[in-house]
Structure formats: structure tokens, C-alpha cells
Regions:
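Terminal accessory regions of large proteins
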Residues: 168, 179-359
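Short acidic (Asp/Glu) and glycine-rich catalytic loops that position anionic groups and cofactors
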Residues: 47-52, 93-98, 141-150, 193-198
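Basic, amphipathic alpha-helical recognition segments used for DNA target recognition
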Residues: 22, 32-99, 109, 114-115, ...
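Short loop/turn segments at secondary-structure transitions that flank enzyme active sites
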Residues: 4, 31, 35-37, 63, ...
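Secondary-structure capping and boundary motifs in well-ordered enzyme cores
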Residues: 23, 46-49, 62, 66, ...
Length: 359
């Protein structure tokens, strides 16, 4: 990376553009520097690198309880108000966060705030377990038990209660009078009052239940996701701690070395009757988990899936689809390539095993 920086910026020492490397890979807190969603600090696991648009804050000794207590305080209304007094809404520079006072905590206060933050983190992680692109992904929402729909509402209610408990503690720590508390708890600024600026944070749209289910089934067919999680044949790993290094794979993904649902050479095909027919495999996956098979899966795969997939796997200007379609102009015949398994032999296999026999 240092060599790339020197090349990219026309020589000179790499330290001109890579700063504070002694803090790389430490656990800490991070936040988007510019966002119209309001100040929102979150846990930054060990093993990460911060940057200009995603700065970081640390504590001496990297103590997890101290970090969690700071996380709770920094997301309180009191802290947010003190930040807003120093600069415009939507812009959260490092210097402003650094200058905002943090009250001294007793051991009891630190533990109480840390427990609240840890519980909120766990609830948020549970909510992310139905998001395919999350490192916490387990299963799509459509495969959760009916009671989980009520559970998701309960998660939101409990998170709101945790925010209220943190706010109450923070008000006391900062010495807010009752009248000041009522003012801080007043209505939030309307969207029309917020100036439009460049936003460093992407907001994920909710995925339709059926599309999410079909996308997961495609992933199982390609060997991306593990069918055994849905059937109960494989137990889930225990929940990590907030500052544990991120896993190389989400819990719902197929572990390295495990037998995939369908053996293939990184290529599946849209061709009825073919042993590697993607549509047949998707329908077989849904049958194994006793999920209803939607009508016109083949039409959905041809007309809608890639646009849906590309949007799901895009962030800002970076597009990173993992399933690549190679189709005829009419779209009546297509090969689907699985990017993580591509090799120097993939195109030869596509031509010799799939295309040549059709000529």
C-alpha cells in the first residue's frame, strides 16, 4: 500500500498520505465524517484500518468496556447536542469529536453504559442477520419462523428503550436540567431544513422478501451459502464480541472445505433440462427447506435477478457483483459465472462444455 501511495501521488514519502499507522488494527469507534443521518458512532473491530471518510477514536489500553461505555455516551442526545453546537449538521470532523467533553465515569457507571451498548450492538447484529451482504448474515427473512416477525418489532422496541436509558444516564452525567432535557428531546430537524451535502454513508434499502429468498437460493446453488443452516444440520457459531476481528465469512456462508449443495466449475446455465440448470437448482433448494416456489422463476432470473443483485452488491460508485451473466442478445440462453471461483480454466470450460455443444 505504501508503494502504491508513492506511485499514485507522484513520489515523496508515503507518510504524507498514510497517517497514524501506529493505531491501525486497534479496536475503537468509527463514524461517517459526513452524513445526513445524524452523528452515529459504531464499534470498529480489531484488524481494521481507518481513513479520512471513516475516522476512528481509541481509548488507552483498548479496554472493551471502556470503549463500549464511550460508544453509549457518544450516541446519546447530550453528546450529539454538544457536537452540534460546534459545527453544521451533517459534518462530524475529527477535531470536533475530539474536543467534545466526556464526563468521568465511576466503575459502576462505566459497567452500566457498557452493558447497554453491548446489548444494543447484539440486537443490531441480530437485525443484520437477514441482510445478505452483512458479515452477520444467517438466513433470508422469508426463512425465519413466523414468530421472528414479531421478534423484529420487539428488537426495535428494546433498542429504543436502550437509547432512552443511555440518554437518562448521559443527562445526569452532563448535568442537564429538566427544562434542557425536554428541549433536547424535542422534535428532530425536518429533512427540508437540512442542507444537501456529500454523504459518506450508504443507506441500505429494504430487500423484498421473495427476492431475498431467491437470491439466497441462487447463493446455495453456487456454493456461497450453506443449506445446512436452514435445515438445522449445522449449528450456528456463538455470537462474537463487539470488537472481535471480523470473520472471513458470515455465519450463513459455506465454510471452506465443506461440500457444496451442487458441484460445478464456477458455471451454471439457464437451460431447462441441463444438469447445471440454475433454475432447477434454485427450485430444488427451496424444496429442501419447504419454502414455496414462486411462479416464473426462470423469467425472474432472466429479467430481474442481475439488476437486483448488482444493486445489492454496490456501494456508492463501487459495483461488486459475484454472479456474472453471459447471455445471448435475446436473453434466451445464459451462462452464470461465480466470481469467487473463477480460474484460468473457466472460459475454456464455458466454451468447451457449454457453448460448443450448442453450435
Amino acid at each position: 500500500m505504501k508503494e502504491w501511495i508513492i506511485y499514485r501521488y507522484g513520489g515523496g514519502h508515503w507518510a504524507r498520505n498514510i497517517r497514524s499507522t501506529e493505531h491501525y488494527f486497534r479496536p475503537g469507534l468509527t463514524w461517517p465524517r459526513r452524513t445526513q443521518g445524524g452523528l452515529s458512532l459504531r464499534a470498529m473491530p480489531a484488524g481494521c484500518i481507518f481513513a479520512d471518510k471513516g475516522p476512528a477514536a481509541f481509548v488507552l489500553g483498548d479496554d472493551s468496556d471502556e470503549l463500549l461505555a464511550l460508544l453509549a455516551l457518544a450516541n446519546s442526545r447530550s453528546f450529539g447536542l454538544l457536537v452540534s453546537l460546534q459545527m453544521a449538521f451533517g459534518s462530524y470532523e475529527v477535531g470536533v469529536i475530539q474536543r467534545t467533553p466526556v464526563p468521568s465515569l465511576t466503575v459502576t457507571q462505566r459497567k452500566e453504559l457498557a452493558n447497554l451498548a453491548r446489548r444494543a450492538w447484539s440486537l443490531k447484529r441480530t437485525a443484520d442477520s437477514v441482510t445478505e451482504t452483512s458479515h452477520a448474515f444467517v438466513l433470508p427473512a422469508a426463512l425465519r419462523a413466523p414468530r421472528d416477525c414479531d421478534h423484529s418489532l420487539a428488537l426495535k422496541v428494546e433498542i429504543d428503550e436502550i437509547h432512552a436509558a443511555i440518554d437518562a444516564i448521559a443527562f445526569d452525567l452532563y448535568g442537564f436540567a429538566e427544562a434542557d432535557r425536554e428541549a433536547v428531546n424535542g422534535p428532530v430537524m425536518d429533512d427540508e431544513e437540512v442542507e444537501t451535502e456529500e454523504d459518506d454513508e450508504d443507506v441500505e434499502a429494504e430487500v423484498p422478501s421473495t427476492d431475498g429468498l431467491l437470491s439466497w437460493a441462487v447463493g446455495v446453488a453456487f456454493g456461497c451459502f450453506d443449506l445446512r443452516i436452514a435445515t438445522g444440520e449445522r449449528p450456528l457459531p456463538p455470537e462474537p464480541e463487539p470488537f472481535d476481528p471480523l470473520p472471513t465469512k458470515a455465519p450463513g456462508m459455506l465454510p471452506d472445505g465443506a461440500e457444496p449443495f451442487h458441484a460445478h466449475e464456477a458455471i451454471l446455465v439457464d437451460e431447462q433440462g441441463h444438469p447445471h440448470d440454475l433454475v432447477h437448482l434454485v427450485e430444488e433448494v427451496l424444496g429442501r427447506v419447504k419454502a414455496p416456489v414462486p411462479d416464473e422463476v426462470r423469467r425472474w432470473l432472466r429479467k430481474e435477478f442481475f439488476a437486483f443483485h448488482l444493486k445489492l452488491y454496490s456501494k456508492s460508485r463501487r459495483k461488486a457483483p459475484i454472479y456474472w451473466p453471459l447471455a445471448t442478445a435475446s436473453g434466451s440462453y445464459a451462462l452464470w459465472l461465480y466470481y469467487p471461483s473463477l480460474s484460468s480454466q473457466t472460459l475454456y470450460t464455458a466454451i468447451n462444455d457449454f457453448i460448443a455443444p450448442k453450435l
